[in-house]
C-alpha cells in the first residue's frame, strides 16, 4: 500500500495552475498576498509557480519561499519539466523555504509521447529516474507526475512510477490532465497503482485533475477511497479550460461526510479527527481574495462559496431554515467563515478601524498601500452612508490592480444623452509624470472612453469582455467593472469599482492596459506547452 501520512494532504496550485486561467495574471504582490492567506488556511503544500518560465515567476516563487516558507508553515513547491535547467532553477527558487519540494513531470500517454515529446517509451524510462535522482540530490522532497495519466497504458505507467520511486520520488502524482476520466475509472487507476507498483509504499499517491466534464471533485473523492492521500486543487476551482478540482468543495466534502470517509483512512466511523489540516473558517475569505485579485468572479450557484450557497428562495425552504437551519443546510455557514456581519464603517471611521476590518477579511496592508486604501475609503464614505465588506474588498482590489502603473487615469469627462453622440475626454498620466488628453466619440459613453484611451496609448488590443455588476444593494452602490483585452492570443483583465460606472470602466480599461504592457515585458513559458529540450543524460 502507498505511504499514508495519516490524513489527506491539500496541495494548492492556485498560484501555478490556477494562474493559467485566461486573463488571471497576477503580479508579485498579489501572489504573495494569496500565498500568505493560503498559509493561514493551513494548506500543506503551496505550488508557488514555474520558476524556469520567466524571471518574474522565479522571483515570485523565491519571495514566497522566503516570506511564507517558515518552519511551521507549508511546503513551498515549484514546478519543473524533466530537464536539468528547469530542476536547478526550481531548487534555487524554493531554497529559502524551510520545507522545499521540486515537482517534476513527464508525459506517459502514447498520444503525448508521439505528438508532443516525440520520444519512445524506452527514452521516458531513461529520462525519468535520471531527472528524479538529480532533483533528489538538490532537495529531500521530490514529486513526480505522470502527465496525462488518465490516458496512459497502466502497465507502462507502473514501470515509470516504480523507476521514479527507486530514484527518490517521495510523492507520485496521477493527473487527469484533460479531465477525461470518470470516477469509477479514476478510482480503479489509483487502486491499480497501489496494487501493482512494488515500491509504492515509499511514496504518497497524489491526484491532479481538470474539470472538463465536471467530474474533478468526484474523481478525487473516489481516489481517496482507493489510496490517494494528496489532492492537488485550486481555490474556486480556477484553472485552464473548465478549471481544476475545487479546494473548498473537496475539503468540505471530506469535512461534512467525515463518517463516510473515515473507514477508507483506517479510522473508526465515528472518529471526530479532521481528515485534512485545513482551517475551514478561512475558506470564504480565501475565496474572496483569490476572486478579487484574479478578477475571476465566483458564479452565484458555486458550491460552498457562491453567493447563493446559503440563500433560500422557496417559501417552504425559508420557513424551514428559520425554524432550524439544518432542515435545508448541511453546512453551518460559520464553518467556512461566512457571517452576516454588516460593519458600521462610515466617514467618521478611522484608519485603525479600517485596517482591522481589512485584516479580518484577509488583507494585510501597511504603509502606502494602507494610505491609498484609506484615502479611497474616505472618498467613498463621502458618497455612501454605509460601507460594507464588499465595498472594502472592491477598494483593495482596485489598489492591487494599480501596482504596476505605467498609466494612471488623471481625469474623465463624458457627454451623452438621447439623440446625442456620446463624447468622452480622458486624461492620462504616464509613469514619468507627463499628462496627455484626448477626446473621442463612441456608440455610448463607455465606448467613447475606450476609444479615447486607445487613441492615447496606441497599444494594439481587442476588447473581448465588458461587464458591470453592483457590489452591494442600494441606489448608492458601487458598480464594479471587469474588462478583458486580448493581444496575440493572451488575455489581460482589468477591474475597478466606483459609484460612477463610467469612471469605473475607464479605470478598469487603464488597469487592463497596464497589465498588457507589463505582460509584454514578462511573457512566461507554459509548462505543458513549452518545448522540452533534450536532457543531459
UniProtKB/Swiss-Prot annotation:
Give the EC number(s) under which this enzyme is classified: 2.3.3.13
Q: Where in the cell is it found?
A: Cytoplasm
Q: Which reaction does it catalyse?
A: 3-methyl-2-oxobutanoate + acetyl-CoA + H2O = (2S)-2-isopropylmalate + CoA + H(+)
Q: Which HAMAP family match?
A: LeuA_type1
- Source organism superkingdom: Bacteria
Q: Which GO terms describe its cellular component?
A: cytoplasm
Native source organism of the sequence: Synechococcus sp. (strain RCC307)
- One of the Pfam families matching this protein, by short name: LeuA_dimer
| Keyword check for Manganese | yes
Identify the cofactor(s).
Answer: Mn(2+)
Q: What is its main location?
A: cytoplasm
**What name is this protein filed under?**
2-isopropylmalate synthase
Where do the annotations place Mn(2+) binding? 17, 208, 210, 244
Q: How is the subunit organization of this protein annotated in UniProt?
A: Homodimer.
Amino acid at each position: 500500500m502507498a505511504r499514508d501520512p495519516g490524513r489527506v494532504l491539500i496541495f494548492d496550485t492556485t498560484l501555478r495552475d490556477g494562474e493559467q486561467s485566461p486573463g488571471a495574471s497576477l503580479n508579485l504582490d498579489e501572489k504573495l498576498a494569496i500565498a500568505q492567506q493560503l498559509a493561514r488556511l493551513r494548506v500543506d503544500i503551496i505550488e508557488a509557480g514555474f520558476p524556469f518560465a520567466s524571471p518574474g515567476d522565479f522571483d515570485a516563487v523565491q519571495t514566497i519561499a522566503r516570506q511564507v516558507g517558515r518552519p511551521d508553515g507549508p511546503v513551498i513547491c515549484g514546478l519543473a519539466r524533466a530537464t536539468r535547467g528547469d530542476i536547478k532553477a526550481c531548487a534555487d527558487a524554493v531554497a529559502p523555504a524551510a520545507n522545499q519540494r521540486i515537482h517534476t513531470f513527464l508525459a506517459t500517454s502514447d498520444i503525448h509521447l508521439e505528438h508532443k515529446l516525440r520520444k519512445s517509451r524506452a527514452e521516458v524510462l531513461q529520462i525519468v529516474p535520471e531527472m528524479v535522482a538529480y532533483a533528489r540530490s538538490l532537495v529531500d522532497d521530490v514529486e513526480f507526475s505522470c502527465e496525462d495519466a488518465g490516458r496512459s497504458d497502466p502497465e507502462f505507467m507502473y514501470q515509470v512510477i516504480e523507476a521514479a520511486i527507486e530514484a527518490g520520488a517521495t510523492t507520485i502524482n496521477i493527473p487527469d490532465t484533460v479531465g477525461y476520466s470518470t470516477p469509477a475509472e479514476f478510482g480503479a487507476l489509483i487502486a491499480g497503482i497501489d496494487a501493482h507498483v512494488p515500491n509504492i509504499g515509499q511514496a504518497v499517491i497524489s491526484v491532479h485533475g481538470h474539470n472538463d466534464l465536471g467530474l474533478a471533485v468526484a474523481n478525487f473523492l473516489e481516489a481517496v477511497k482507493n489510496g490517494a492521500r494528496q489532492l492537488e486543487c485550486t481555490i474556486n476551482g480556477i484553472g485552464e479550460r473548465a478549471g481544476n478540482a475545487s479546494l473548498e468543495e473537496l475539503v468540505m466534502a471530506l469535512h461534512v461526510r467525515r463518517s463516510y470517509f473515515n473507514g477508507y483512512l483506517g479510522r473508526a466511523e465515528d472518529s471526530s479527527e479532521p481528515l485534512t489540516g485545513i482551517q475551514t473558517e478561512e475558506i470564504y475569505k480565501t475565496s474572496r481574495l483569490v476572486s478579487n485579485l484574479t478578477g475571476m468572479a465566483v458564479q452565484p450557484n458555486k458550491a460552498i462559496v457562491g453567493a447563493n450557497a446559503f440563500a433560500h428562495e422557496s417559501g417552504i425552504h425559508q420557513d424551514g431554515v428559520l425554524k432550524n437551519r439544518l432542515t435545508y443546510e448541511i453546512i453551518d455557514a460559520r464553518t467556512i467563515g461566512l457571517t452576516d456581519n454588516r460593519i458600521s464603517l462610515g466617514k467618521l471611521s478611522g484608519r485603525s478601524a479600517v485596517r482591522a476590518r481589512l485584516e479580518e477579511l484577509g488583507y494585510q496592508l501597511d504603509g502606502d498601500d494602507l494610505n491609498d486604501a484609506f484615502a479611497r475609503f474616505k472618498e467613498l464614505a463621502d458618497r455612501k452612508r454605509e460601507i460594507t465588506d464588499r465595498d472594502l474588498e472592491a477598494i483593495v482590489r482596485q489598489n492591487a490592480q494599480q501596482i504596476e502603473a505605467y498609466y494612471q487615469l488623471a481625469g474623465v469627462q463624458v457627454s451623452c444623452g438621447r439623440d446625442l453622440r456620446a463624447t468622452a475626454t480622458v486624461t492620462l498620466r504616464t509613469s514619468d509624470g507627463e499628462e496627455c488628453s484626448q477626446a473621442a466619440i463612441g456608440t455610448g459613453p463607455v465606448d467613447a472612453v475606450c476609444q479615447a484611451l486607445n487613441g492615447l496609448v496606441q497599444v494594439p488590443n481587442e476588447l473581448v469582455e465588458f461587464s458591470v455588476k453592483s457590489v452591494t444593494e442600494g441606489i448608492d452602490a458601487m458598480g464594479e467593472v471587469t474588462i478583458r483585452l486580448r493581444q496575440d492570443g493572451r488575455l489581460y483583465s482589468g477591474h475597478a469599482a466606483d459609484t460612477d460606472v463610467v469612471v469605473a470602466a475607464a479605470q478598469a480599461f487603464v488597469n487592463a492596459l497596464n497589465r498588457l504592457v507589463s505582460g509584454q515585458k514578462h511573457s512566461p513559458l507554459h509548462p505543458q506547452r513549452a518545448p522540452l529540450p533534450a536532457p543531459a543524460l
